[in-house]
Amino acid sequence: MKYELTAREARVIGCLLEKQVTTPEQYPLSLNGVVTACNQKTNREPVMNLSEQEVQTELDNLVKRHFLRTVSGFGNRVTKYEQRFCNSEFGDLKLSPAEVALITTLLLRGAQTPGELRSRAARMYEFSDMSEVDSTLEKLAQREDGPFVVRLAREPGKRESRYMHLFCGEVDDTASFAEETPPVAGELQARVEALENEVAELKQRLDSLLAHLGD
């Protein structure tokens, strides 16, 4: 696939896509901002602990591949990065806000059920109902320039199948899945995580505001 990424590249792009929507006042992101976003404890699976040098290497690679671009100049004391992975002026990949929300959540969290995706993507896009989630996933799975997601085989006893993005290559549909919580508990956990993410982002905004006032 034209857009095939490594796991670390997927994390970096997912973070930039997320912050572009959820904290636009802090976007584009500096190197430090990207490191912080990549290593977040909430809304990340797996949790990573990348160094500045490791993140810088990924940023440089993505700039060379034209998936990111640097932003510098008047008023910018440090180099910042913005994504050109999708919906950029000269890029080919065009996604709707709903598609961006689902792709971003899959890049950051891996395989998830439609119910989990709806809860976890709510900060980026508010789906009207589960039918909209399902139809958006179906479109991503059937796009002519894709497919970009795949529906995984449902495990025995599970109510919903999980979906996974294909930006890191084909997914082994027969691979054994990690143990999952029951559907109701899983949905509750997703809602708790969404609230934790909101609190974390509010704290991040407050810290940024206090730092700005202190300058």
Curated annotation (Swiss-Prot):
Pfam families the UniProt entry points to: DUF480
Disulfide links within the chain: none
Superkingdom to which the source organism belongs: Bacteria
Keyword Protein biosynthesis among record annotations: no
Record-listed N6-acetyllysine modification sites: K80
InterPro entries in the cross-refs: DUF480, WH-like_DNA-bd_sf, WH_DNA-bd_sf
UniProt entry keywords in alphabetical sequence: Acetylation
Residue stretches in coiled coil: none
Stored PANTHER family: UPF0502 PROTEIN YCEH
UniProt-listed HAMAP family: UPF0502
Family recorded in the similarity comment: Belongs to the UPF0502 family.
Protein name in UniProt: UPF0502 protein YceH
Species annotation: Escherichia fergusonii (strain ATCC 35469 / DSM 13698 / CCUG 18766 / IAM 14443 / JCM 21226 / LMG 7866 / NBRC 102419 / NCTC 12128 / CDC 0568-73)
